[in-house]
Amino acid sequence: MTEHLTEGLKKQILAEIDTALASTDDGAVESLAVTLLSTRRIFVTGEGRSGFMAKAFAMRLMHLGLPVHVVGETTTPAVAEGDTVVAVSGSGTTPGTVRVAEQATQAGAQVHAVTTAPDSPLGTLAATSLLIPGATKYRRPGEAPSVQPLSSLFDQTTHILLDVVALRLAGLLSVDNDRARKAHANTE
């Protein structure tokens, strides 16, 4: 009986992700990929699970040979003009992420938001937003309904869409799995 419940939950989660992905703007995904190809350096930022999604994206960009840094790490250089910051926040109001976006903008960098809320503080600071129609912990009007807790649907959809961006970049850069694997950590 519990196996039936588990199978039903898996199907429900996959249906939620599929619905969210079907509502995203492919042009915005393509635009982000093209922007990242032409930027001087890429920085990613986010807090909590959004931060995990940003770090996973940074790892893929590194595998592709792109100059990427995670904001807050001890080896992260100063953001400057010509750089791009990808800021992930479901609500678009996460104080640390908004502060990084403000500082990056003041430094002359271009900010690209990954959020559910284009009119949020983060969304208004950003040059562009990759809108993710997934539920956040706030369950604001207009957010997709979800059986999952907090921002799980936003996080899952973000992970998949940022992997799509990475795949587009891999194609544009002619980086296949063998080449990406050579850039993978060999000290683990």
Model segments located where?
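A short, well-structured juxtamembrane/interface segment
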Residues: 21-38
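Generic N-terminal amphipathic, Lys/Arg-enriched alpha-helix
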Residues: 1-22
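A short, charged, Gly/Pro-tolerant segment at domain boundaries
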Residues: 1-3, 164, 170-188
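Glycine-rich phosphate-binding loops that contact phosphosugars or nucleotide phosphates
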Residues: 41-47, 52-160
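Hydrophobic packing residues in well-ordered alpha-helices of helical domains and bundles
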Residues: 6, 10, 29-32, 54
